[in-house]
Amino acid sequence: MLSLRVPLAPITDPQQLQLSPLKGLSLVDKENTPPALSGTRVLASKTARRIFQEPTEPKTKAAAPGVEDEPLLRENPRRFVIFPIEYHDIWQMYKKAEASFWTAEEVDLSKDIQHWESLKPEERYFISHVLAFFAASDGIVNENLVERFSQEVQITEARCFYGFQIAMENIHSEMYSLLIDTYIKDPKEREFLFNAIETMPCVKKKADWALRWIGDKEATYGERVVAFAAVEGIFFSGSFASIFWLKKRGLMPGLTFSNELISRDEGLHCDFACLMFKHLVHKPSEERVREIIINAVRIEQEFLTEALPVKLIGMNCTLMKQYIEFVADRLMLELGFSKVFRVENPFDFMENISLEGKTNFFEKRVGEYQRMGVMSSPTENSFTLDADF
């Protein structure tokens, strides 16, 4: 409680004034002047502020690294202009994606109908459900790009890539929807497949895992980059392999060719996620990354060996589990960490996917096609008469 000090009564006796040593002294604005009530309140509030605020200062200094500590996420007033290029490796990834552009209209599905009719019921069941997962998952990837990554990342080169990735994911989703629309004639079954996130528990489980990362406000950008590298690198891997298995059997040329194009694009998107991870100053720990990757592996293994077993199309479930682990190890290495499972690739036909194809360009467009001149340097496009032959 604040105490009020009563001011000294004025001295009126002339004799006292003569004897007083305080005669002629002014006490106004001196240190020993009793403070007024308003001044006392100010002093009390300042003291209280010091008492309650000072202990919190060390906590502020020791806080976790924020956006300002990450060059990728820091406010960038020059983000509206592309040149001059600052991150050349990220820009090259964008140009590589741009050179790989394709559209759904370029895929010939005319031979697929006859093949589809000749497939066993369990093979048709498997393919249709894999396509349903793919059609929904590309939309989820785009949701993350639009809602989170494109808004968080401030460097122009990465924003260019994310913008182009959004366009390509739309084309992938269109392609998968077109495949379902072409193969499935029953309207009710078609509707069931288009709403796979709601109608198919095995697809919903994978979708929920990805959607949870989009909505997680506590997870760092680095953790979410790893999670979506797992979505595009692990969640898609087994399904891609199962469709390439059909190619090995000479089935469904339109489906398998679109699978080549899409798997190449998703591989590039996964590589880009790893590149962004490498540019981070404050990365998640290896233990945290392993936890995210292993979680994704378990969900994908369950999806393709229990919920939608690959044995339906004649593949070995045990080998599929091993292949998913092999893909996860490759992703861990690309992120800069050590392998988790240390297994070999059990599918020899998947080794050829990374090699340059020898397809006759005049028979059909090759899966490793790139647009003319996009990846070449200015000097490569110049005309000269003194070139060496």
From Swiss-Prot:
How is this protein induced?
Up-regulated in response to DNA damage induced by doxorubicin, camptothecin, UV-C, methyl methanesulfonate, nocodazole, or gamma-irradiation.
Which Enzyme Commission number(s) are listed?
1.17.4.1
Top-level class of the enzyme under EC nomenclature: oxidoreductase
Residues of the signal sequence? none
- Cite the Gene3D superfamilies for this sequence: Ribonucleotide Reductase, subunit A
Residue positions of motif Cy: 49-51
An annotated Gene Ontology molecular function: protein homodimerization activity
What PROSITE patterns does its record include? RIBORED_SMALL
Coiled-coil region(s): none
Catalyzed reactions: a 2'-deoxyribonucleoside 5'-diphosphate + [thioredoxin]-disulfide + H2O = a ribonucleoside 5'-diphosphate + [thioredoxin]-dithiol
Q: Which cofactor does it need?
A: Fe cation
The entry's comment on post-translational modification says: Phosphorylation on Ser-20 relieves the inhibitory effect on Wnt signaling. Phosphorylated on Thr-33 by CDK1 and CDK2; predominantly in G2 and M phase.
| Record's cofactor remark | Binds 2 iron ions per subunit.
Source organism superkingdom: Eukaryota
Which residues are responsible for catalysis?
A: 176
Q: Which residues bind Fe cation 2?
A: 169, 232, 266, 269
The modified positions for Phosphoserine read 20
The alphabetical list of record keywords is: Cytoplasm, Deoxyribonucleotide synthesis, Iron, Metal-binding, Nucleus, Oxidoreductase, Phosphoprotein, Ubl conjugation
GO CC list: cytosol; nucleoplasm; ribonucleoside-diphosphate reductase complex
Indicate which residues the UniProt annotation says bind Fe cation 1: 138, 169, 172
The misc remark on file is: Two distinct regulatory sites have been defined: the specificity site, which controls substrate specificity, and the activity site which regulates overall catalytic activity. A substrate-binding catalytic site, located on M1, is formed only in the presence of the second subunit M2.
Q: What does this protein do?
A: Provides the precursors necessary for DNA synthesis. Catalyzes the biosynthesis of deoxyribonucleotides from the corresponding ribonucleotides. Inhibits Wnt signaling.
PANTHER family annotated for this entry? RIBONUCLEOSIDE-DIPHOSPHATE REDUCTASE SMALL CHAIN, RIBONUCLEOSIDE-DIPHOSPHATE REDUCTASE SUBUNIT M2
What family is this protein classified in?
Belongs to the ribonucleoside diphosphate reductase small chain family.
Under which name does UniProt file this protein? Answer: Ribonucleoside-diphosphate reductase subunit M2
Q: Which organism is it from?
A: Homo sapiens (Human)
